[in-house]
Structures are given as C-alpha cells and as structure tokens.
From Swiss-Prot:
This is Uncharacterized HTH-type transcriptional regulator RB1450. The lineage of its organism: Bacteria, Pseudomonadati, Pseudomonadota, Alphaproteobacteria, Hyphomicrobiales. Residues 40-59 bind DNA. It comes from Rhizobium meliloti (strain 1021). PANTHER family: MANNOSYL-D-GLYCERATE TRANSPORT/METABOLISM SYSTEM REPRESSOR MNGR-RELATED (PTHR44846), MANNOSYL-D-GLYCERATE TRANSPORT_METABOLISM SYSTEM REPRESSOR MNGR-RELATED (PTHR44846:SF1). It comes from the Bacteria.
Length: 244
C-alpha cells in the first residue's frame, strides 16, 4: 500500500500530493479488488484532509481519464494498462508498441532549422553552430498521448526531415527517404520528474503528474550520429523496458 502521509509545508498543494498517491495506488493495484477508489470520507480520514481537498484530487485524476465518478456508486477506476516500450539496440516507436495498441498516432507540432548548441553538438559529433533540423512531435496509442519529443538531425544530411516526417509519420521512414536504411541506439539516459506546464498540456496530464525523460543518440552503422532526442513519456501510461 502507498503511504498516506501528506506534507503541509513542502510547497506542493495537498490535493496534488493526494492525486499523486492515489495515482500510484491505482498503478500498484491497491484498489483492484473492488475496481473503485475508496469513498471520499475514507480518503479524507486516511490523508488527514477535508473532503473538498479529496474532491480536487479526484477531479484532476478524472481529467486524466484515470477515474470516473459514477452516480450512486462512487469513483470507478478507468484503469488502462501501461504499454511496455523497449529500449534496445534498434529502438523503433511503432515496432516497440507492437500489438499493445490498435492505432498508433504521430503529430508534427513544429519544425525549424537551428544552430547546434554545446550539449546537442557534442551528442551529434558536430561543431557548435552546425545547422540542425529540429522536430517537435507527439506520439499516441489508441488516442492516448504517450510521449512528446524534441529531436535534432544534421541538416546537411537530412535536409527534408521535416517534410518527410510530416508526410510519412515515421522517423525510420523519413531516414529511409534520405537513403539511411538502418540505424542503432548508441546511448540512452533516463530521469523521472514532475511534468512541466507544456508537457501537461501536450500529454493531457494533470498537475503533479510524472514523466520519464530520455535523452538518446542514434547513429548509422558506421557510427556517425544521426539523431539526438529528448523524449518525455507519461509515466502512468508507459513503462520503459531495457533490452540488452
């Protein structure tokens, strides 16, 4: 069971702390026996808060699609299993989701040509200031936003990356359109943190939700970096699986 203590002096609203704990309890299967979140009065007693605070937490979780109020019954869990996303030598979004979802969606939010900054230049092995193609994207499974990413590609080699991605909806296919038929994952760093305002909006999360951020580099088979990405996954919808 998830610890029910909330901290009144930690700078995070009580309802957000409670929403986090209920979200984790749902994820852990603590309420699976009934399929219902405990009554508001019970939650208020467990957390040591009033019912209004509990209602605010449940309303936030309802906005995420995690729970649903049912008249005369209480709050029902709309539990959807996390999809398992493998990180391996050949990491591909659509192949990674496999048969876990019926429909995979990708959206190009924006693109630009930008100069390589220090960290990104180092990751791609290019001098600072080198022109890069920047893509901002959101990916979903069965209509649920799963991740949002900002990715960078050497502009000299992948000049049409934005146009190809917009048309094909796939990084792998956009690479192939530039003559790159295969590429591999070189490195992946993973951190977990609270979602920022833009991520809450793009992933349709409530305040206090957690994202897992990966910073990754892909390279061609000769070892030349071709992509640097910063991807944020909704932690209550995706679990990352490291394959070696």
């Amino acid at each position: 069971m998830v610890a029910k203590v909330v901290e009144r002096q930690m700078g995070v609203a009580l309802w957000r702390q409670i929403a986090d704990r209920i979200r984790l309890a749902i994820s852990n299967g603590d309420y699976d026996a009934t399929g219902m979140v405990p009554p508001e009065t019970a939650l208020a007693a467990e957390f040591g808060v009033n019912r209004h605070t509990v209602r605010s937490a449940l309303a936030a979780l309802a906005e995420e699609g995690l729970v649903r109020a049912v008249q005369g019954r209480g709050t029902m869990i709309e539990r959807k299993d996390r999809v398992s996303y493998p990180i391996s030598r050949r990491t591909r979004f659509s192949q990674g989701l496999g048969r876990q979802v019926r429909e995979i969606g990708t959206e190009l939010l924006g693109h630009a040509q930008v100069p390589a900054s220090g960290e990104i230049a180092t990751a791609l092995g290019v001098p600072p200031g080198t022109p890069l193609i920047e893509l901002s994207t959101v990916s979903s499974g069965d209509g649920r936003p799963l991740s949002t990413a900002v990715s960078y590609y050497p502009a000299e080699r992948f000049a049409r990356m934005a146009e190809e991605y917009a048309q094909l909806g796939s990084v792998t296919k956009a690479f192939a359109a530039h003559g790159l038929d295969d590429y591999v994952r070189v490195s992946t760093e993973i951190v977990a943190r609270h979602a920022e305002a833009e991520e809450l909006s793009l992933l349709k999360l409530s305040p206090g939700a957690i994202v897992m951020e990966t910073q990754s580099v892909n390279a061609d088979l000769e070892g030349r970096p071709v992509e640097y990405s910063r991807t944020r996954f909704a932690a209550d919808r995706v679990k990352l699986r490291i394959e070696t």
